[in-house]
Amino acid sequence: MQREEKQLDMLLEAVLNRLNDLKHSIGVMIHRLETEYETINWPTFLDNFALISSHLTGLMKILSTEIGTPLRNLTVLPLMLTPERDEALLQLTEGRVPIFSHDLAPDYLRTKPDPGAESRQAAHEAKANNLTVEASMKQVAQYNKVISHVWDIISKAKEDWENESSTRPGIQQTSSMADTQALVAAVGLGNGLTAPVGPPTGAGVMIPPAIRQGSPMSAVSPSGNAPMGKMPSGIKTNIKSANQVHPYR
């Protein structure tokens, strides 16, 4: 009995070590994908993936060559169930399982599918087993016919594309380098542009701002007449002397 318990402890320790290595490798890979997604290269990603694959292979090898009593013959039973938060359990599971209650224990210790999923799987298996050979062969033939039709369409499209690519002389030119250079020279340097002869008809003469600002407002009017004098005001004013005594003083 002691020998079997010792072998079981050794097996569990080896499995836990391999699981910790696997968890660490997965965490490192996820961290790199989240932080180094712009600089990570394909060989580095393949190296991380190969490391995870090696840990999985080692874990499967340990489980396949079990030492002592096979794990599938053992039963895991909870020692204590409580609806309260267990800090020791939270620390032991690295924050994943805070409570080990009556409602959660079956889900954590379940080794078979959910009863509803198991019943649906059994119904599908029974339906597949009740299918006759003729019906199954007919369905397989229809499936192969659909696959062949899709394959023919893809193959024909591939052949048409290859023929079109082989017969195409090349990329058709849609621009002229000479015309582009002439346009750039005309816009940037004015090459090829001629100025009009004589002043344009109907255009006014522009006066520089300095001349406009320095000219007085009493300049000659556009009609050539002299500026108009001061117009007489129709309002009569009565200016009194300042030394006149106010009547209300």
Swiss-Prot record:
<keyword id="KW-0539">Nucleus</keyword>
<keyword id="KW-0175">Coiled coil</keyword>
<dbReference type="InterPro" id="IPR019364">
    <property type="entry name" value="Mediatior_Med8_fun/met"/>
</dbReference>
<feature type="coiled-coil region">
    <location>
        <begin position="1"/>
        <end position="26"/>
    </location>
</feature>
<feature type="region of interest" description="Disordered">
    <location>
        <begin position="215"/>
        <end position="249"/>
    </location>
</feature>
<feature type="compositionally biased region" description="Polar residues">
    <location>
        <begin position="215"/>
        <end position="224"/>
    </location>
</feature>
<dbReference type="GO" id="GO:0003712">
    <property type="term" value="F:transcription coregulator activity"/>
</dbReference>
<comment type="subunit">
    <text>Component of the Mediator complex.</text>
</comment>
<dbReference type="Pfam" id="PF10232">
    <property type="entry name" value="Med8"/>
</dbReference>
<dbReference type="GO" id="GO:0016592">
    <property type="term" value="C:mediator complex"/>
</dbReference>
<comment type="function">
    <text>Component of the Mediator complex, a coactivator involved in the regulated transcription of nearly all RNA polymerase II-dependent genes. Mediator functions as a bridge to convey information from gene-specific regulatory proteins to the basal RNA polymerase II transcription machinery. Mediator is recruited to promoters by direct interactions with regulatory proteins and serves as a scaffold for the assembly of a functional preinitiation complex with RNA polymerase II and the general transcription factors.</text>
</comment>
<keyword id="KW-0805">Transcription regulation</keyword>
<keyword id="KW-0804">Transcription</keyword>
<keyword id="KW-0010">Activator</keyword>
<comment type="similarity">
    <text>Belongs to the Mediator complex subunit 8 family.</text>
</comment>
<feature type="compositionally biased region" description="Polar residues">
    <location>
        <begin position="235"/>
        <end position="249"/>
    </location>
</feature>
<dbReference type="GO" id="GO:0000978">
    <property type="term" value="F:RNA polymerase II cis-regulatory region sequence-specific DNA binding"/>
</dbReference>
<protein>
    <recommendedName>
        <fullName>Mediator of RNA polymerase II transcription subunit 8</fullName>
    </recommendedName>
</protein>
<dbReference type="GO" id="GO:0070847">
    <property type="term" value="C:core mediator complex"/>
</dbReference>
<dbReference type="GO" id="GO:0006357">
    <property type="term" value="P:regulation of transcription by RNA polymerase II"/>
</dbReference>
